[in-house]
From Swiss-Prot:
Topological category with respect to the lipid bilayer: Multi-pass membrane protein
Alphabetical list of PANTHER family matching this protein: ADHESION G PROTEIN-COUPLED RECEPTOR B3, ADHESION G-PROTEIN COUPLED RECEPTOR
Name of one Pfam family that matches: HRM
Miscellaneous comment text of the record: Autoproteolysis appears to be cell specific, does not readily undergo proteolytic cleavage in HEK293T cells.
Top-level lineage group: Eukaryota
Main localisation: membrane
Encoding gene (name): ADGRB3
Record field: transmembrane: 881-901, 911-931, 940-960, 982-1002, 1024-1044, 1099-1119, 1126-1146
Sugar attachment sites: 51, 54, 82, 105, 241, 337, 418, 540, 625, 779, 812, 828, 937
Name of the protein in question: Adhesion G protein-coupled receptor B3
Source organism of this protein record: Homo sapiens
SS bond list: 30-55, 303-336, 307-342, 318-326, 357-392, 361-397, 372-382, 412-447, 416-452, 427-437, 467-502, 471-507, 482-492, 514-549, 537-567, 819-851, 839-853
Domain named CUB: residues: 30-159
Amino acid sequence: MKAVRNLLIYIFSTYLLVMFGFNAAQDFWCSTLVKGVIYGSYSVSEMFPKNFTNCTWTLENPDPTKYSIYLKFSKKDLSCSNFSLLAYQFDHFSHEKIKDLLRKNHSIMQLCNSKNAFVFLQYDKNFIQIRRVFPTNFPGLQKKGEEDQKSFFEFLVLNKVSPSQFGCHVLCTWLESCLKSENGRTESCGIMYTKCTCPQHLGEWGIDDQSLILLNNVVLPLNEQTEGCLTQELQTTQVCNLTREAKRPPKEEFGMMGDHTIKSQRPRSVHEKRVPQEQADAAKFMAQTGESGVEEWSQWSTCSVTCGQGSQVRTRTCVSPYGTHCSGPLRESRVCNNTALCPVHGVWEEWSPWSLCSFTCGRGQRTRTRSCTPPQYGGRPCEGPETHHKPCNIALCPVDGQWQEWSSWSQCSVTCSNGTQQRSRQCTAAAHGGSECRGPWAESRECYNPECTANGQWNQWGHWSGCSKSCDGGWERRIRTCQGAVITGQQCEGTGEEVRRCNEQRCPAPYEICPEDYLMSMVWKRTPAGDLAFNQCPLNATGTTSRRCSLSLHGVAFWEQPSFARCISNEYRHLQHSIKEHLAKGQRMLAGDGMSQVTKTLLDLTQRKNFYAGDLLMSVEILRNVTDTFKRASYIPASDGVQNFFQIVSNLLDEENKEKWEDAQQIYPGSIELMQVIEDFIHIVGMGMMDFQNSYLMTGNVVASIQKLPAASVLTDINFPMKGRKGMVDWARNSEDRVVIPKSIFTPVSSKELDESSVFVLGAVLYKNLDLILPTLRNYTVINSKIIVVTIRPEPKTTDSFLEIELAHLANGTLNPYCVLWDDSKTNESLGTWSTQGCKTVLTDASHTKCLCDRLSTFAILAQQPREIIMESSGTPSVTLIVGSGLSCLALITLAVVYAALWRYIRSERSIILINFCLSIISSNILILVGQTQTHNKSICTTTTAFLHFFFLASFCWVLTEAWQSYMAVTGKIRTRLIRKRFLCLGWGLPALVVATSVGFTRTKGYGTDHYCWLSLEGGLLYAFVGPAAAVVLVNMVIGILVFNKLVSRDGILDKKLKHRAGQMSEPHSGLTLKCAKCGVVSTTALSATTASNAMASLWSSCVVLPLLALTWMSAVLAMTDKRSILFQILFAVFDSLQGFVIVMVHCILRREVQDAFRCRLRNCQDPINADSSSSFPNGHAQIMTDFEKDVDIACRSVLHKDIGPCRAATITGTLSRISLNDDEEEKGTNPEGLSYSTLPGNVISKVIIQQPTGLHMPMSMNELSNPCLKKENSELRRTVYLCTDDNLRGADMDIVHPQERMMESDYIVMPRSSVNNQPSMKEESKMNIGMETLPHERLLHYKVNPEFNMNPPVMDQFNMNLEQHLAPQEHMQNLPFEPRTAVKNFMASELDDNAGLSRSETGSTISMSSLERRKSRYSDLDFEKVMHTRKRHMELFQELNQKFQTLDRFRDIPNTSSMENPAPNKNPWDTFKNPSEYPHYTTINVLDTEAKDALELRPAEWEKCLNLPLDVQEGDFQTEV
């Protein structure tokens, strides 16, 4: 058996030598590992018990982050002539790394080469190793010397931050011993540690020199007894027990057990005196106190582990019969070594950074590798691939045309005699800007055959020729020749040609071919549907661009938008080349700084927003290269660089780049690559952070959190994102998405790694719109949530804990939402796909979905999208929209045609506003139909949306303009040209301002979508229409309330002061109303009634049209944006057509002015003042009169003519100036057929009836005008005179009709028209002579004279009116027109003209020239050419004047007794007039019959009582305010 055992040992040793080599076998048997020790001293023989070379002694640092190892080497008595001692440190215990370290000979200390007696070393890494190396061919030490037994090595584990008293004491002892040995030379005894301060004498520590010797040749393990030796100050629970000395075991107990040295010690107090060795041995197994109650130690327990270093424990009990306590420990432990070695499994190192793309253009490959630490002692090898590849595609390379191989030589052209042979080659098509092939494509050579025989024979068939057509069926042919026919003359039998059909596919129709197009400075040639056309990229980019010709749903070919996925801007390409230049520097810091500069440049480029789709892929590639460079160079970017990185990502993920991403991802899924780059960058940043440090990065589209957390410090769950964090962007703060990371997940994969040094890097990212740019899913599946990412490095251990994720839905109406995570192991190219494995949906509702996932990844919510939600553009509007818009436009066009035909009669502000309103509605209807057909054309759709927005708002604004015009008419505001321009600014200017502002802010983003040509419903752009429209409706309601309140005010009097003074009147100013409507003269009451009627019509129109308009456009918006619902289209058709008919009904059929104008149009009425219009308007064209200007014009032409001598001229002249009328005012004609034109003022008066007062002969001064009311009976007799000035009755004869007494009738006068004939004075005097000949001869006077009335013929040569000097130069030639602003002079001339028919006696008896002079002087300073600016002032003057003359008529008519006594009329009362026979063109006017007279009779004002209204003619009543 012994022989067998020896044989097995020999075989096993031989096997080890063969497998591992001799040196490896030596390393296996002479390696020592020491760990769990805080202090120790060793000799060379203890460290290297075997006499082999390359033996090692390794010391492990308990925690490199907390402790440092100090090593003392005493060379004084050691001879290093036969070997070398190497000292070095490393982090990972790997034989390959140690060999690599020895090969580089970097940071290795040669201890034997030191010139000093002591060598002090400090190490901060995980392992310290000392290696003994013999020279080559040295047999080794044969025996051990005495110096091998001495302690030459001492080490100490010392706390970095707060060293212990024990540690500092040991360091100071080393220093003191060095100083003593070197005789005070301090330069060779340097220990660089500033935390300890050594005392001048060691006794100050309380430890004597004798006790220090006891620490030599001992080892202090790290246990409960020595725990206090590592702390600065001892706590109550810590001890530094050195009360007993444990000597090393004897030689027979000391040996090697595996690769660990067994060392034992007995703690000893540093205060204890040295005792003899025999006493110590005697007391070794006795109780420290010497009491009999302490039992002996038990046997050592078995080793705690079966392989590697373990521990053994022994205990004892205390039995104290006398109630005293036992002293000393009751439990001891020691290190035990086991001969069995623990297997070490193979471990993969970190992946190397991705290499650059193997090609600069075209499809290349990126590679990364990793190395495996080989297993030891039977461990498992590494599992998984060593190399990882992935594709990369930067840009397409230009491909030159290449000649293919030559074809084989054809057969000889003849089968006999000499002929030729041909061969050809083909050229592959050049692509992406490559050059064509160069050189010939065919070659020929001679062939030699035997001479031809006598009989003809067919040769072989040739190749088929090319097809004659490329489509719709062509023909191809092949031939063969007959050999020997020339010699023998006999033809071969059969045919020498064959034909067959080819290319029978159908040719595309003309409408299936995209025509040649010029777009973006590129010409796109004709291309059939389904094919691609290629072009060179623009000048600022390289590569090729493509454009597809597709078929629409109706089978018509159309060009799609060009694809720029293969175009890369020159700036991006230069930036990519600069990365290679930085990498070529070869220095870590320079490369890292260069990458930071690259990110700054890339940030500037991405912020310009003018890049191509290919630039997005290039940007992702640049970010990947930057990240890999940071990782390869172990470079930690600064905070600015990190912020720039995430800002670049945010710029790339902007929603504006959605179409570019869709274009780019047809070539390569760059968005998925971008997610992986961000995760790698997060861990690079996290590894450079301090413990417990976190960083929040917030941008417009990305929110990221990076935290570095020790495993032991994670006490609570982690929530992301943090809503209340300062500076959080709004979209993330308002987001309802969150993820809860449980604390239990922070557990390493290996349980041995779980200690205080385990640190995790946690990264979490929330993307705002990454779902928009990810590749489109199939089967109508969409991403219905934001995307959130959670990643942790190193990878935590799989536990039963779940990540709780809650995501909000982005779109409503989706079906079957479920949770997914991104799994990158399900595709061949390592890109990944969405997977449901590892995630389960626990709760879902209409707006949220809650998930529980058992792994870290990228999470989202997928849902099914109903197919009917996808809206396809039909190309033509629906029939319902066409019918509704057509009916509305037809009604409004009809209204416009009617107004155009009657424009000369109904032209006014209200009519102009209506025409503009109709124009806006018609334009809106047309644009609605156009927008339904142009959804595929981006530019036309955007333009249509902008104009539709404008006309929608304009329709609302014109309704508001109509309400404003009504309000100004009711309140009496003056409407000048400036006001009318403000109407246009409100109707067209305000909508244009709103649309221009909206387009400017949005840059047309949202004006038109892929499905409809209207404002986008997303982003709040719709408020640009709803807001202004709602404001217009609100203001319109306010104006309507004000107008209605004004219309229902008391008595219709506008001025409150006049209303108070007027008192109670039955019919105020009714006596001023002529019953003859032909004259066109109305009273103030009639004017107010007309204004109120128009205002009420406008108010009623607003109340009906405005709600209908709002309903119409609301239904139009719904019909345009939701084409699936036919209900909205029907509602729009109903409301739109109803709106058109309502507008026609309100503004055409029911409008009184239109009715009157239409009747006049049917009777072919003409304007009698057309020939005279040029005199009124110097510019030769008419101007629209405002409602108030019409009122004033009527008032000025219908003022009561009071024939009271001098009072009349002064009073009326000062009162009836043509105030606030424009110079180019248009006067409208009177309908001779009897139509009422109360609303069309300024008509030429065809007939005027004047009732001559009875008291004309009665003298009356201005003082008498202010007398109180006279008795009624004093004014019963009146003489009436009817004056007709109709120009059509020029041939009328003069006839005096007997007077007919009419009681209580008022006297009236009508202002003359535009001209009067005045006879200029022959002498330049200050007086004006007015005679009968100055009267206009067109007039025919009919007087109804009372028989008692005595009228004497006037003598005109004695009738002189002494006017002031300022009236003298205002004489006119005959037939010269007066200016409208000279109405005062016109009126004076008319008054003098009428006075020419009075008798001399009446003139002399009734007119007091001195009184006239006095009154004229009072008004000489008045400036009657100034303009009044308020209608309130005008109405006040007009009403006050009429009230004064009404009062005068009632109280001044006192019968003259002298005149009544002589009732005989003068014999020659009308001698002054010429014979009517001299005017043959006149016709005689018949006496008015009873009906006509009733129609023309005057209605006097019947006052209820006498008014105490003084006739005040002070200047203050008639002064105008300028």
